[in-house]
Amino acid sequence: MARVTVEDCLDKVETRFDLVVLASMRANNILKKGYSESADNEKKEKATVVALREIAESEITPDQILRNEIEG
């Protein structure tokens, strides 16, 4: 997928507002794990773009994001 859009993600999440919260949680989780935009991917994507792409491509579900947030 060349570009991630909100519409790509809305099939997986009920509302845009939920999408914002979930993508933010996932991006923070990615950064906590030591993600580096320069070292970890050749496209130099930001953590928020990676989070949205994972949601759009069903690599991670909203339930998994919430579970990861609770477990810390």
Curated annotation (Swiss-Prot):
Pfam families: RNA_pol_Rpb6. Keywords: DNA-directed RNA polymerase, Nucleotidyltransferase, Transcription, Transferase. One of its GO terms (molecular function) is DNA binding. It is an enzyme of class 2 (transferase). It catalyses: RNA(n) + a ribonucleoside 5'-triphosphate = RNA(n+1) + diphosphate. HAMAP family: RNApol_bact_RpoZ (MF_00366). PANTHER family: DNA-DIRECTED RNA POLYMERASE SUBUNIT OMEGA (PTHR34476:SF1). The RNAP catalytic core consists of 2 alpha, 1 beta, 1 beta' and 1 omega subunit. When a sigma factor is associated with the core the holoenzyme is formed, which can initiate transcription. This is DNA-directed RNA polymerase subunit omega. It comes from Francisella philomiragia subsp. philomiragia (strain ATCC 25017 / CCUG 19701 / FSC 153 / O#319-036). The gene is rpoZ.
